[in-house]
From Swiss-Prot:
This is Pescadillo homolog. One of its GO terms (cellular component) is nucleolus. Present with 4530 molecules/cell in log phase SD medium. GO terms for molecular function: large ribosomal subunit rRNA binding; mRNA binding; ribonucleoprotein complex binding; RNA binding; rRNA binding. It comes from Saccharomyces cerevisiae (strain ATCC 204508 / S288c). Keywords: Coiled coil, Nucleus, Phosphoprotein, Ribosome biogenesis, rRNA processing. Residues 355-449 form the BRCT domain. Residues 562-571, 585-598 have a biased composition (Basic residues). Changing I380R: Temperature sensitive mutant. The modification Phosphoserine is found at S288.
Amino acid sequence: MRIKKKNTRGNARNFITRSQAVRKLQVSLADFRRLCIFKGIYPREPRNKKKANKGSTAPTTFYYAKDIQYLMHEPVLAKFREHKTFARKLTRALGRGEVSSAKRLEENRDSYTLDHIIKERYPSFPDAIRDIDDALNMLFLFSNLPSTNQVSSKIINDAQKICNQWLAYVAKERLVRKVFVSIKGVYYQANIKGEEVRWLVPFKFPENIPSDVDFRIMLTFLEFYSTLLHFVLYKLYTDSGLIYPPKLDLKKDKIISGLSSYILESRQEDSLLKLDPTEIEEDVKVESLDASTLKSALNADEANTDETEKEEEQEKKQEKEQEKEQNEETELDTFEDNNKNKGDILIQPSKYDSPVASLFSAFVFYVSREVPIDILEFLILSCGGNVISEAAMDQIENKKDIDMSKVTHQIVDRPVLKNKVAGRTYIQPQWIFDCINKGELVPANKYLPGEALPPHLSPWGDAIGYDPTAPVEEGEEEESESESESEDQVEEEDQEVVAGEEDDDDDEELQAQKELELEAQGIKYSETSEADKDVNKSKNKKRKVDEEEEEKKLKMIMMSNKQKKLYKKMKYSNAKKEEQAENLKKKKKQIAKQKAKLNKLDSKK
């Protein structure tokens, strides 16, 4: 019998520690982390850590051995090793004072690309769109950061550029479906090629960068995500027939940098412009050759030209006469439709699938300077509306060119307005958000300047939980009190029923005697029968509850430990949600009571 070697099977073979992986790949720990981020390899948790670590109980990080073997054939790994030798040569040249050789090394420095990794990790385009949420969140985060020693201004500008290109595409194709303004920032949801994409855009406030953040790891993720977004944007722009990257209008960018400063050109128009000059040149060359040959032919055949011209004229006359005769023969009667009631006219299908895409197509919005233009401009343009910004108008020289008579809505975030223009609807910014979330135009009465706004709810909230928009019923408290009293009565009756179940036989024997006694006292038998019915109802209710509990217990017995834990977690979370909903309902009732009291006092005054 062969003796089995230790640590050659199972967890010891399938897992490898981080220090072993770094030693095997012959790279530094920082390069190993970067490589794992690029390739999407993460630490794993073995079932038996002691066996995986070959008997040791020291806390370590484990990876799959196959993943590390897969990393050994990565081209980026070779580039990391080349960079290591380059850094060694550069430090040696600088130490010796050889500036020219250091410059030459810097100019010939090798660079790596992540294109092949993107293709490996996302073999199809829908896969890339499904994983684009984290990429957008990271890029929008960096686009709002201030430039520091750790994060250069070039990185921030590149992130801003990619973010604006993404927003410009979404607004152009009108793909926004949901929006929610929270404490963290603004959440957007768009439908990209049938996939729901949700991302967070932070508010443009000055950020205080914490000192404990490891920017090396974050910048590695940013490098990968920016490459991924370049791929995705190129595909989206080309599928829509647009040129990528879009051009930037420098004049508009200087006035106010926004989506309006991007020029989205069609690829078809551009291709036609490129093809026209070549086609014109070819036509000119052909015409010049034909003219030279014709001159020589005319000089040679001057005598025959007159005869040929006469014959051609006669043939043309004959053809015209034949055509007239045919038209006279084939003329048909014309029938006019005298019916005033026309048939049903079919509504032509819209270019856009969702009603949100053309929600503001008939409106022109004038955004006041106190309102954040970047949020509202993106939402209004993606719903088909037009935007005029007061902040941008302050910097424009020729204000007369802008037609302000077309403005239908003015978005204001002030409590009181002194001067109002007739014909405009004055609203607060929340009107835009609620219209998009509901998919229809909401009445503007509740959103007038200075009005108390309705609650701004998350469109991705739990449908089972508390609904703040539900009206408060006046008799809810009385019902709850009566319900609690009835429950107490039912419990008392149940206890009596349980005690009476033991001696049912005695009750049957004494029933006749009770009836006789009641008749002697003058009490009707029908009253006692109604009381018995109530008792029977409560008895049936209790039986149903007991049966349901027994069924649940039996199902729990048949479950595995994993399923039992999951079921308990679900029960706990549902109970918590119900408790929170009840607390919020109670608060709402109290607020409604206080408002009613205040209204009564105001009416008395």
